[in-house]
Amino acid sequence: MADSEEWLEEWLTVGKIVGVQGLQGELRVNPASDFPERFTVPGPRWVRSKGSPPREMQLKTGRQLPGKSLFVVRLDSVDNRDAAEALVGSDWMVPADDRPQLGEGEFHLLDLVGLEARLSPDSDPIGTVTDLISGGNDLLEIKRTDGSKLLIPFVEAIVPEVHLKDGWLLLTPPPGLMDL
């Protein structure tokens, strides 16, 4: 395993910096986490630009935009629009051991990435979950075995079973969803 892959295993990407807000260096973060305190409670956070290791920055303030899944955050060392724009596209990260404890049958959404997607428990996989897109409803991005991509709403009616230990999830899509 390459050194860069080794340090990546020590981190979880819990959001992506997708834009700037205003002139004072505020950043818009699209979360990939069900824990809003990662974007609102002041303290150390880590930001990783593509190809670089995460660097520690201090979160000063954070708030969720009303009616949206986006958070607006202010970092200690980012005080103008130019500095903020330099961080757009960066990952918002936490140490891998910073996962909140979960109850029986619960899982972290990020754990879905890498799972095989199947249409029945005994069938061959139709693809692999490659990303999670947060929004009004979370979407699973699945790379199909033919290389095409498929977006599946992550709701219990369509994804009724998740088998983390076995590395797969079950899809029961309504007619036509697989054809999109």
Curated annotation (Swiss-Prot):
Swiss-Prot/TrEMBL keywords: Chaperone, Cytoplasm, Ribosome biogenesis, rRNA processing
GO BP annotations, alphabetical order: ribosomal small subunit biogenesis; rRNA processing
One Pfam family matching this protein: PRC_RimM
Location(s) in or outside the cell: Cytoplasm
GO CC terms in record: cytoplasm; ribosome
Entries under InterPro entries matching the protein: PRC_barrel-like_sf, PRC_RimM, RimM, RimM_N, RimM_N_sf, Transl_B-barrel_sf
Keyword Isomerase: no
The organism's place on the tree of life at top rank: Bacteria
Keyword rRNA processing: yes
Domain PRC barrel, chain residue ranges per copy: 104-177
GO MF, any single term: ribosome binding
Major location category of this protein: cytoplasm
Transmembrane region(s): none
Sequence similarity: Belongs to the RimM family.
HAMAP family given in the database record: Ribosome_mat_RimM
Assembly and interaction partners: Binds ribosomal protein uS19.
NCBIfam families for this protein: 16S_RimM
Comment on protein domains: The PRC barrel domain binds ribosomal protein uS19.
Protein name, entry field: Ribosome maturation factor RimM
Organism: Synechococcus sp. (strain CC9902)
Gene: rimM
